[in-house]
Amino acid sequence: MKSISIPARLLGTAFLALSLTTSCSDILDEQPRSTYDPSFFKTEKGVEGGITSMYAHLRYIYGQAYYYNSCQTGTDEATYGFSADGNFKDADLSGVGNLTASTSRSDALWGTAFSNINTANGVIENGASVGISEALVSEARFFRAFDYFLLVQTFGGVPLDMGAGELKFNINPNRVSVRNTVPEVYTKAIFPDLLKAAENLPEQPRVKGGVTKTVARLYLSKAYLTYAWWLKNPNQIPTYPECPRTDPDGHDAAWYFQQAYDVAVKAIENPGPFGLQESFWQVNAGPNDRNNEILLYADHTQEDEYYNGGSLSYGSGGAPDNFAGWMVNWNYTDARSSDGKSVLIRTAEQSYGRPWNRMAPPQGVFTHTFADKTHDSRFDGTFTTVYRGNWSTNGKTWESVSNANGMQVKEREPIFSFVAEDMDKVNYSEEAAKQNNLGAGTLPGRADWVLGLDKVSRYAYPGLWKLGPYRTDNGSGPGQPNAGSTRPYNIAKFSELYLLAAEAAVEGARTQAGKTARDLVNVLRARAGRWTYSNAEYKEVDRDFSAEMVAATPATIDINYILDERSREFFGEGYRWFDLVRTQKWNEYADTYTICGKLPEQGYNVKTDHTPKTHQRTIKPFHYLRPIPQGQLDGMEMSADEKKAYQNPGYRD
């Protein structure tokens, strides 16, 4: 199948509600250009280039680590790590920073999304007149709805008019802006676009990675579900701009929950080329990237820097690089053997990668979310818990090294492990901690240094294997571990359809035979019991605990169980803040968290402080919306009072 070729230079239009100019790159004929006159959209080539650019814009959102931080930090899945700066501490809401219009990293979404929306407006306005099929125009409809859906969840109501009228292509500078209400954004933009996309997009993608009916149905179901929760408003969270929580079309929350269920089930029953992988491990394994469970991804490649969108040898630390995987990755390279050798080398392998240590999973991730580590493969398929000696990638030819308990360890045998068993038996002696340089301990008869999962800290925690790098050009060396990941960043998965339908069913949707909330959840839980590979054991396995997983599912499923399953299935992928905000469970799930150690700035041996500490977050109702970025406010030619009114309440000082 033909692939979408996306150069580094993104076609798009710049919009911060203050200037709207057109800058395009002709993607399809692979002739890079820096600027075009807006009339270019009145040509077939221009419209096609605009559509291709919409795939490229995904790189400026997904894999962008600071935006990723805004979707994860401050939830039950992540707090700030030992090396975090203000970007991460501000998002944690635990008293070590302050989330404001200037510090919130949701700004990465605002500018990118509106630029793409205006491009989509141009494509939709001009597509038919230049002979572009509705199927192709519907790709633009999908991406316009996609961006508006992200925006309305993040900021509340946002502008539909960028200066030329609602949902019109704007080519003139515009320094004023009026925000539409949440119901207007859903009913005027998101739902109509997704309905047309679901109707007109093909079942088979026109190019590899192209959008289809299935992904349109997933986002339509999710939009219906999110809007239903907004109408229900169980905890009386305020919205902005202020408006009644009523639907302009006269439907109630129950109607939208039903629509969410029906659309998700229709997508499950009409999957096209998509489906579930045999095992959870296969979904996220680098060699299996772009598999048929992935409905949408922000693509990258190791084959060419131009089409990768960034260097193949160093990381810029900014978009369009895919560097989100660096954030939940601790300094494993600090490890030493008992004879003082550096034995864990930074490599471009999925279990290793570049350690930035900006974010850390709290202990509840390991005690609650992933409590079952024996039957449920999702713990093993999410984290790196065993770090194996790889000194040969650094040119060392040692046959073995002396390690814990004076025992010998060979290349690719465990040097260090996080353990869930025998945690009370680990000996955290001062001598061992000094030798291994990690603050780790020993267990009798084991050659690897160990740290119990009850000792997880901001410094040391299992790395997020899911987002680790994978390249085939490493040779016998470390490869290019400092480059952004050349893997695609997965955005939407077929598996989510089951949990969307299950969530709608829990909220009262009438269910079909064989597709109750429990039935739907158990499809994924049964799959989670199927092991084809063990990361910890570093080998293929053939184990089936599907029956045990299904038997352990509660007879009655509630929304908390759905949220737990969503975390087990999609941990660390950028879903969590949206999930907790949608269901208004953020306070319940994340107002406190436990992690070892004091605050880094208090001065102590971060590696050996294994004392758990519970931290309190201050999550107020206004936090359920992010602040409008300061750059947007600064660029508007409006009065101080008008700008204040434009900003979400709680962020105006």
Please tell me what each predicted stretch does.
Residues K2-L11:
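Bacterial N-terminal signal peptides that target proteins for export
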Residues K2-S3, L18-K45, S221, A502, ...:
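Bacterial Sec-dependent N-terminal signal peptides
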Residues C24, A113, Q282-E349, Y459-Y461, ...:
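Long, intrinsically disordered, low-complexity segments
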Residues S25-G86, V158, T226-N436:
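An aromatic- and glycine-enriched ligand-binding surface/loop that stacks and positions planar moieties
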Residues E44-Y66, S83-F155, N174-K213, N427-Y489, ...:
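Conserved, well-structured interaction surfaces
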Residues H368-D372, D376-R527:
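C-terminal substrate/ligand-recognition segments
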